[in-house]
Structures are given as structure tokens and as C-alpha cells.
From Swiss-Prot:
It is found in: Cytoplasm. This is Exodeoxyribonuclease 7 small subunit. One of its GO terms (molecular function) is exodeoxyribonuclease VII activity. It comes from Corynebacterium diphtheriae (strain ATCC 700971 / NCTC 13129 / Biotype gravis). The keyword Ribosomal protein does not apply. Its EC number is 3.1.11.6. Keywords: Cytoplasm, Exonuclease, Hydrolase, Nuclease. Belongs to the XseB family. NCBIfam families: PRK00977.1-3, xseB. Heterooligomer composed of large and small subunits. Its main location: cytoplasm.
Length: 85
């Protein structure tokens, strides 16, 4: 029975490096990882590999969101300083 595969290649080369993914790419892949895990059709080792990938993707998404929040706060700070002068 074939399994759903994410990424390109085989084995550990199947996934693009997480640090190279945009927020949207990481989010979309995370959604797909969750979908595949919820099917429950893989063995333990394969499931763990997908779970680990999902954790890394979630962390990457959080990094992107934190960076966006910092940019917004900086822009708002610059805007409010401009109004005070």
C-alpha cells in the first residue's frame, strides 16, 4: 500500500530544509503532515519522522510570526515617535 510522501527524493532527502521555507510553505506542509499522521497508516518509525518534521515546521512558523510581530512593533514605534516630534 503506497504512502503519501511529502517533499522530493527519498528517505531523509525527501524534505526541503525547514530553514529555507517561507511561512506559507511551512504552514502548508505542516497541514499536510498532520493530515498524513491522522490517517494512521504508517509504522512507528515513519510516524515519528513525520511528527519530528511537524514539530520543526511548527517552530519555523512560530519564528516567522515572531519576526513579523517584531517588524510591526518596530514600525508602530517609529510611527508613534514621528507623531511626538
Amino acid at each position: 500500500m503506497p504512502h503519501d510522501i511529502i517533499g522530493q527524493g527519498t528517505g531523509t532527502n525527501a524534505f526541503a530544509p525547514v530553514e529555507e521555507l517561507s511561512y506559507e510553505q511551512a504552514r502548508d506542509e505542516l497541514v499536510e503532515v498532520v493530515r498524513i499522521l491522522e490517517l494512521g497508516q504508517m509504522g512507528l518509525d515513519e510516524s515519528l519522522a513525520y511528527w519530528e518534521r511537524g514539530e520543526a515546521l511548527a517552530k519555523r512558523c512560530e519564528e516567522h510570526l515572531n519576526g513579523a510581530q517584531q517588524r510591526i512593533e518596530k514600525a508602530l514605534g517609529e510611527t508613534s515617535q514621528g507623531h511626538e516630534q
